[in-house]
Swiss-Prot record:
Keyword Plastid: no
GO CC annotation, single: cytoplasm
InterPro entries: ATP_PRibTrfase_cat (IPR013820), ATP_PRibTrfase_CS (IPR018198), ATP_PRibTrfase_HisG (IPR001348), ATP_PRibTrfase_HisG_short (IPR024893)
PROSITE patterns according to UniProt: ATP_P_PHORIBOSYLTR
Enzyme Commission code: 2.4.2.17
GO biological process, one term: L-histidine biosynthetic process
Identification of the protein by name: ATP phosphoribosyltransferase
Record pathway: Amino-acid biosynthesis; L-histidine biosynthesis; L-histidine from 5-phospho-alpha-D-ribose 1-diphosphate: step 1/9
Record function comment: Catalyzes the condensation of ATP and 5-phosphoribose 1-diphosphate to form N'-(5'-phosphoribosyl)-ATP (PR-ATP). Has a crucial role in the pathway because the rate of histidine biosynthesis seems to be controlled primarily by regulation of HisG enzymatic activity.
Organism encoding this protein: Bacillus cereus (strain ATCC 14579 / DSM 31 / CCUG 7414 / JCM 2152 / NBRC 15305 / NCIMB 9373 / NCTC 2599 / NRRL B-3711)
HAMAP family in the cross-refs: HisG_Short
Lineage top rank: taxon: Bacteria
Length: 211
């Protein structure tokens, strides 16, 4: 059996997907007790894991460093990569929203300024609506932008809405629902077809049985 390398991202998504891998028989004990390590070998299978930043998962898969990647749909929507999107894992579910202070008027004809970490997704959404907006890209916390007058509204990922509420913002539009996806390197799907599809099929069955 050829080794399969899987790229994961640290944090919330990692905690969601580790149980899925364990349920299909892939040992994740090293991954759960990782310390500062970034590369891990499953003890009972031909699978190894690498931990990288969320925005880099698809890059590692695209360039063949990883055969499989687990990444949020938001990353795939914002950054076009030459990979196969194989499976919706049904975890890490949240949504893209337009949010602002309560006095914001989404129906105003004035050109709006929208602050976001996701300029491509945001521009596409408003273009499809026929609205001309100015996109202001922000890397940090976007919630502050409407409060300080930098932007009329923000586009961001919302899970519980608690952060918005704490900053006095409300949701005006729900744009897209997103979740964790399994992606695969195109060349690896040919050279390691049996190994990759074995993981995909077991994962799919586990997801369906859990619904």
């Amino acid at each position: 059996m050829r080794n399969i390398q899987i790229a994961l991202t640290k944090g919330r998504l990692e905690k969601h997907v580790i149980p899925l891998f364990e349920q299909i028989g892939i040992d994740c004990s090293e991954l759960k007790n990782k310390g500062r390590k970034l590369v891990f070998q499953s003890k009972n299978t031909n699978v190894s894991f690498i931990l990288v930043k969320a925005v880099d998962v698809a890059t590692y898969v695209e360039h063949g460093v990883a055969d499989i990647g687990i990444v949020g749909k938001d990353i795939l929507m914002e950054n076009e990569k030459d990979i196969y999107e194989m499976l919706d894992l049904g975890v890490g579910i949240c949504k893209f929203c337009v949010a602002s202070i309560p006095t914001y008027n989404p129906k105003s004809y004035r050109k709006k300024r929208i602050a976001t970490k996701y300029p491509h997704i945001t521009s596409t959404y408003f273009h499809d609506k026929g609205e001309d907006v100015e996109i202001i890209k922000i890397e940090g916390s976007v919630e502050i932008a409407p409060l300080l007058g930098l932007a009329d509204a923000i586009v961001d990922i919302v899970e519980t809405g608690k952060t918005l509420q704490e900053n006095g913002l409300i949701v005006f539009e729900e744009m897209y629902f997103i979740s964790a996806r399994m992606i695969v390197n195109k060349a690896a799907l040919k050279t390691k077809k049996d190994e990759i599809f074995s993981i995909i099929n077991m994962m799919e069955q586990e997801i369906l049985s859990g619904k």
